[in-house]
Curated annotation (Swiss-Prot):
Similarity comment text for this entry: Belongs to the UPF0441 family.
Domain of life of the native organism: Bacteria
Leader sequence segment: none
SS bond list: none
Region (Disordered): 180-224
Biased composition, class Low complexity, residue ranges: 204-224
Protein name: UPF0441 protein ECA0329
InterPro entries hit by this protein: Biofilm_formation_YgiB
Pfam families found in the cross-reference section: DUF1190
Length: 224
């Protein structure tokens, strides 16, 4: 009986230690999980050009210019492309479009071929600048566009090549975005029809509102 009693006491101690340590382990895991979540966002600044960036950050003039030039190159590859100037102007407004080589994989679109292998794209209206993904010392950038037509769901606002909206097209704004916002967008491989980019923006706006509403509901639930 004495041996059995000792065994039972030792088993009880082990179980007690296990139950006592479990909440601690869960708490530590939660801390690391939350820290990981916090690192998924990035603070970025939005500028219309390199001069605006340099004025706001005098010690970073070189980085501002480099980011701006890289954004211009990115815009040439990823901006929405249109077969005609009229289609581009209809979505982005007068004096907001420029001619560019037709997409590399334009498919069977006849219009670019008829205009000498050229298409039309919106001018870059600004760029987003933030730290590179992975915590590097350099900066990443993303070209931004801004429709100037009342019919556009993004009239007077900054949007990226994927149609995601970043609010008023004012220079010098700072905001928090997912790190994925700074990731390079796929190169444009075909032209779109008039109104096509506006539809993409509208869908993105709807998704952003839905996500914001979901996050708000989750916060209220967690807050009790």
């Amino acid at each position: 009986m004495k041996r059995t009693k000792n065994i039972n006491q030792e088993t009880f101690r082990k179980e007690w230690r296990t139950h006592r340590l479990a909440p601690v382990a869960l708490a530590v895991s939660a801390v690391f999980f939350l820290a990981g979540c916090e690192q998924t966002d990035e603070t970025v600044s939005l500028y219309q050009n390199a001069d605006d960036c340099s004025s706001a950050n005098p010690s970073m003039a070189a980085q501002c210019t480099t980011a701006y030039n890289n954004a211009l190159k990115e815009a040439e590859k990823t901006a929405p492309k249109y077969a005609t100037k009229e289609d581009c102007v209809a979505e982005f407004g007068e004096a907001q479009c420029t001619q560019t080589p037709a997409p590399a994989q334009a498919g069977m679109a006849a219009e670019p071929q008829q205009s000498g292998g050229m298409s039309w794209m919106p001018l870059m209206a600004g760029y987003m600048m933030g730290r590179m993904m992975g915590g590097g010392a350099g900066f990443a950038q993303q070209p931004l566009f801004s429709p100037k037509t009342p019919a556009s769901p993004a009239n007077g606002q900054f949007v990226d090549a994927a149609g995601k909206n970043y609010g008023n097209a004012a220079t010098g704004r700072t905001m928090t975005v997912p790190k994925t916002a700074l990731a390079p967008k796929p190169a444009t491989t075909s032209t779109i029809t008039r109104g096509g980019f506006g539809e993409t923006v509208a869908k993105q706006n709807s998704m952003q509102r839905s996500s914001a509403s979901s996050n708000s509901s989750s916060s209220r639930s967690m807050g009790g």
